[in-house]
A protein has these predicted regions:
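Active-site-proximal alpha-helix that buttresses catalytic centers in soluble enzyme cores
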Residues: 1-158
Length: 158
């Protein structure tokens, strides 16, 4: 890593689930990152349904650290409404999402994160105070390393 990690916070962001398995997975990835890069300032958080939520996670990153930048890595397989619209809104960053990109035009899975969301276990009014740069990385996407895992899962179940 060539950049100054002492000035950069890293937030590994999971969707969030009522089941505990998702929390265990994102905790494990966070721990792996910390073990490989001990000087890194890394936290995990959830978009919804679990804590720490995005504001709580950013507040944990910035507490006692003089950060200039936060890199948010959505640990999602692909872009979707959450990574294109909802997460940028929660982070307070500009996005170029066009609602007409929604295929079929009849999306029924509503998320209005600016108000009261019935799935949340936390207060939607929570905020964070960070004046530095927030970068939203791409989700995992198409990657031969993920394809290797897919092949392993098939082989394990033949």
């Amino acid at each position: 890593m060539t950049s100054d990690l002492s000035k950069t916070g890293i937030l590994l962001l999971s969707h969030g689930s009522r089941l505990d398995q998702g929390k265990k997975v994102i905790e494990a990835y966070t721990q792996m990152y910390k073990e490989e890069f001990p000087e890194a300032i890394v936290e995990y958080g959830f978009m919804e349904m679990r804590e720490p939520n995005i504001p709580q996670s950013i507040n944990k990153l910035t507490n006692g650290n003089d950060l200039e930048k936060i890199i948010v890595v959505p640990v999602f397989v692909a872009h979707g409404l959450h990574t294109k619209r909802d997460i940028p809104k929660l982070l307070g960053i500009e996005n170029d999402f066009d609602e007409s990109e929604i295929s079929g035009g009849h999306h029924e899975h509503h998320h209005d994160h600016g108000h009261h969301h019935h799935h949340h276990d936390h207060d939607d009014e929570e905020t964070f105070d960070f004046d530095g740069e927030i970068v939203l990385a791409d989700p995992l996407g198409i990657d031969t390393r993920l394809y290797e895992i897919i092949k392993d899962r098939v082989s394990q179940n033949l």
